[in-house]
Amino acid sequence: MIKAAYCEAISAVNGLGLVKLMGRYSGFIARDACMSNQNVDFCLVPELPFELEGPDGLYEAIIERINEKKYCVVVVAEGAEEGLINPEEKITKVEKKDESGNLIFDDIGIYLKGEIVKYALSKHKMPITLKYIDPTYMIRGVASNTEDTIMCAKLA
């Protein structure tokens, strides 16, 4: 999926490929996917604090990267909102829980999809061609490889 986002990003003017991967409380799936693919510019995970706006924020970093390379690829774990430094930037305003008692997060991928484009237009007058990919259920439907099977057996 990251390769698809990369292909979409490089084939568009000011292209941005945004991929949301599983990872509510841990970003190891997003991290490992980024490490195995050399085309990712930014990886957002719940464990590492980050800002969206401001001079050191994600939005400015994306603009800078697009200005340099003409494209950018971002991978975000679904629970990355937990890493936001500024509580006012949180997208989940009301705490909700599912039947099992797990927190329900608002969709950070959809949120970023809209906000990055708006930010680039309003602050830099830069139109961005953003392609958003959410392969969550496709990942669950694939048979595990040998390493995953061994790890699961050890954890069990």
Task: Describe each model-derived feature in a short phrase.
Residues K123-A156:
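C-terminal active-site/capping subdomain that shapes the small-molecule cofactor and substrate pocket
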